[in-house]
């Protein structure tokens, strides 16, 4: 059973953790918490800049007690999250190298990164927004969440591993025998610094025995941008509480234009769906949206689950959609 602990103050949460006992085999896990903010402040009016290769970047001034250059470390990955204002919930990838070359108080944003939730932004909409600079989660950081520790092996079939979903399937990253290096089949590269974005979860493949996994951090106190793609995609809710499909926004006619909306159908294969990994079965349980655009069911059942807390912070799930929605927002549930 997952364990959630949460300590807060009258203004904002101080700390939280999501803990779960994982058995040998496959188990899903999401990462709903954020690391402590490295910098918080107010965004100013940005100007255009370029990186060292001439690629377009946004140079954003931030009014804060510290400077971005004082907290960014070369070789590490960070993002800027909008915590208040017109663009609340948006996450914009930080170009660290370019940021360190800018004037004091500025950060370079890479809107071309697939991890940025906006590909373009107006200066007026970002100006005066409250923002936070946050470090990304990596495979190495996930490795540090286990007790007892993960056990590596140079034989991928014997090593503890993490499965990451992309491009229509899972890629397995396994821990090598040095218990430091992460590889995937057919590659000699070290993937320990590979980023797991806030909207992603992973499947954990344990071969060395049961372990306790503890994800510690701070609860997100702003809405969460989750851009929807057509087809299958991994997803997280962004929050360390169980939520329902209704809270997730998985109903029709709730705001998006028809070409970006959820699609319901009484035939499961033709309906949008959510697939949640069930470690007890070693497979996914599928839920689908009915033609009324509101009712969520599983195959062979007439029970309506729209208001049931199916989406949990310590689980892995996929979303299947006919339509993309590049402006999908999960509203903060607390």
Each PLM stretch: what is its role?
Residues 75-85, 131, 160-164, 272-276:
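Short conserved beta-strand and strand-loop elements enriched in small hydrophobics
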Residues 26, 91, 159-160, 197-201, ...:
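Extracellular structured ligand-interaction cores
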Residues 173-218, 286-334:
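Charged, amphipathic alpha-helical scaffolding segments
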Residues 8-124, 135:
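Autoprocessing Asn-cyclization modules and mimics
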Residues 24, 30-57, 157, 171-172, ...:
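Long, low-hydrophobicity ectodomains and other hydrophilic envelope-associated domains
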